[in-house]
Amino acid sequence: MTIDYSYITIIIPTLNEAENIERLIDSIFLLYPSISCLIVDDGSEDETQSIVLALKNKYSNLDLMDRSKEPVKGLCSSVVDGIQSCRTEYFIIIDGDGQHPPEFIQYCIKTLNLGADLSIGTREPYATRWTFSRIVISYSASILAKIRLLLCGVTIRDPMSGFFGGKTKFVQDILSQHKKSFTLGGYKILFDILKKVPKKCNLSGFYYPFGLRECGTSKLTIKIIIRYVLSFFR
């Protein structure tokens, strides 16, 4: 029996992911045929958008949002626009670089079906091929985020995760009420959302193996790190 996933939208923010995106989209629809998938592209200069548009002929539930003319760029603003445009009951965010395994989307769905307002993926031990500096940056950012969230009464294993899902209306309300306090040019939208969740929010999660980028280059820059640090004071 085919499982119905039509009440869920997978939102994938992209920027120059031509080497990854087709394989990722094919995997998603192979595993979850009835799910919706929205690619939110931040103005790719490669063939990312052309590939997605071609795949729309193959997958009727695939859509593309082109943000190339938007004044504010960045991963956070792409995710915010994707969530605000979502029309299904639930959404799930994954990266377009292959680091979030599509086969683990099912575990996010399971926790959402059990009543979670937000379901957050926790990265398993760091990939063995990560550089020492990358491990230090990631670990330090996570510790700082946990301390900041404790001030809001929120305890979570991996506040820097980019793999998470939630009730669409629940998160849309948070965005509409607190959007000015979000770092839209930043890199980690979940951290901003968690700072604004109500005290009785039902937070749940799942574990997943955090992969290495399959192709392309990381979007993490010094400017993004500075914006992240400044977000602690919002």
Which residue ranges define each predicted feature?
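Acidic helix N-cap motif at the loop->helix transition within catalytic regions
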Residues: 19-23, 46-55
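Acceptor/aglycone-binding surface of glycosyltransferases and processive sugar-polymer synthases
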Residues: 67-85, 99-183, 187, 213-223
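A conserved acidic beta->alpha catalytic loop
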Residues: 41-50, 98
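Hydrophobic helical membrane-anchoring modules
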Residues: 1-8, 23, 30, 151, ...
